[in-house]
Amino acid sequence: MKESQLILNIRKYLATIPGCFYWKEHGGQYGTAGIPDIIVCHKGKFIALEAKVGRNQPTRLQAATIELIRRAGGVAAVVRSVDEVKEIMQTI
């Protein structure tokens, strides 16, 4: 599976959660480097999800951003499946 397909599957899942606001962060020239793929707000909690497949790992900048989000009180994670996202969302 490609990361783009995983992101699509995660977005489809998030769309089923009442009151869940989310958006796909777009990289490239007009995006902000290091920002996780999907940003979520649910029940007042900030959640950042970086999708990776296979053995792919976050870049140093992505890992640093995830750590900054956690230090600020948000939830941030590298996710490899919709099931992992479900586990995170069930803790909110």
Identify the residue ranges that each predicted region occupies.
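Catalytic phosphate/metal-binding cores of nucleic-acid and nucleotide-processing enzymes, i.e., regions
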Residues: 1-92
